[in-house]
Design a protein with these regions (language model features):
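N-terminal beta-strand motif that seeds the catalytic metal site of vicinal oxygen chelate
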Residues: 1-17, 62-67, 123-156, 169-171, ...
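Conserved active-site tyrosine of GNAT-family acetyltransferases
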Residues: 19-24, 82, 113, 158, ...
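Short, charged/polar, Gly/Pro-enriched secondary-structure boundary elements
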Residues: 48-53, 113-116, 198-202, 264-265
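A compositional/structural signature marking long, glycine- and acidic/polar-rich segments
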Residues: 184, 189-190, 194-195, 199-249
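Core segments of cupin and vicinal oxygen chelate
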Residues: 1-50, 150-199
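Conserved donor-binding loop and adjoining core beta-sheet/short helix segment
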Residues: 34-70, 93-95
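Vicinal oxygen chelate
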Residues: 5-14, 57-153, 187-193, 238-300, ...
């Protein structure tokens, strides 16, 4: 199976306006007015019709991540591989495919219960992308919109699923103590790439599934100033800063983390490593960042 990229994120909310304000005033995303209504908010960050679909419901949480395949043949091959591996999936049908702005899509769960969708033929918008915060553009072309980090209580089981079933490749295994104490518990993460140069498209963090359903997602901008402006906007709008500015040790991303209305974090970064996979050896990292990234949980 050759998954090309992370194509979209689905989120449930009890307050659509809160997400609208967050996307417009902080992140700099563009609302797709032709798709959005009083129950659904479609958000753009490039030429695609949407990258985030926020829908009203009873809770604030992650619903699913969509991953794209190159064409119908690749999509059908992916379903055949799932069948051979006895992995259950759901044909989502024409109505859902229309909502996702794709030709066809299926839904499935990873071993931890994280909801995934596979699709092909994602639709481009007929309107140019114009950031509400004059961002020069997000780094998406050929890379997908960013990455996601899932919780996985059984890290090895989930890791094998992404490698053996979905066809991801290993980028990095990271483990480090959670704090300076000699008996501090160890943090363990697997970072994996799909069929594009982004250092990782999916990471797995060994932990129970959080109430928000997701650890974090990431978007990438073109320069360090855009990161700084984003940090300013977050603070000006009283958004909780989950992590200070820093540079990661594995993908070299300079970024900060802020809380979304759903409770999971959004990493807002620049300068992520685009890898030549033909000349790459899997990494084993002992520190999450070279500098910065002091994490601060919300008070409530």
């Amino acid at each position: 199976m050759k998954i090309q990229s992370l194509s979209y994120l689905l989120v449930e909310t009890t307050d659509l306006q809160e997400w609208d304000d967050y996307a417009k005033d902080v992140v700099g995303l563009m609302k797709n007015d032709s798709l959005s209504d009083d129950q659904n908010l479609y958000l753009r960050m490039d030429k695609k019709s949407f990258r985030f679909h926020i829908t009203t419901g009873d809770s604030q949480k992650y619903l699913a991540a969509g991953f794209s395949l190159s064409n119908k043949a690749a999509f059908d091959d992916a379903k055949s591989e799932l069948d051979r591996a006895n992995i259950e999936y759901e044909e989502l049908g024409d109505e859902i495919a229309k909502l996702r702005c794709v030709e066809e899509c299926i839904g499935l769960n990873d071993p931890a219960g994280n909801r995934l969708e596979l699709s092909y033929g994602s639709e481009d918008s007929s309107e140019p992308f114009i950031s509400t915060q004059d961002i020069k553009g997000f780094i998406t072309e050929g890379l997908g919109f960013g990455h996601v980090v899932f919780a996985a209580p059984d890290l090895e089981l989930a890791h094998r699923f992404y490698i053996d079933i979905l066809g991801f490749g290993d980028s990095d295994y990271m483990n480090f103590p959670m704090g300076p104490a000699p008996d501090a518990p160890e943090v363990k993460l697997n970072f994996m790439h799909c069929d594009n140069p982004r250092h990782h498209t999916v990471a797995l963090y060994e932990s129970p599934i959080p109430p928000s359903g997701l650890i974090h997602t990431m978007v990438e901008v073109n320069d360090i100033d855009e990161v700084g402006y984003g940090l300013d906007r977050a603070m000006q709008n009283n958004i909780h800063i989950s992590s200070s500015l820093g540079r990661h040790s594995n993908d070299m991303m300079v970024s900060f983390y802020m809380q979304t209305p759903a409770g999971f974090d959004l990493e807002f970064g620049y300068d992520g490593w685009q890898v030549d996979w033909d000349n790459f050896e899997m990494q084993k990292s002992k520190i999450p960042s070279f500098w910065g990234h002091a994490f601060s949980p919300p008070e409530n």
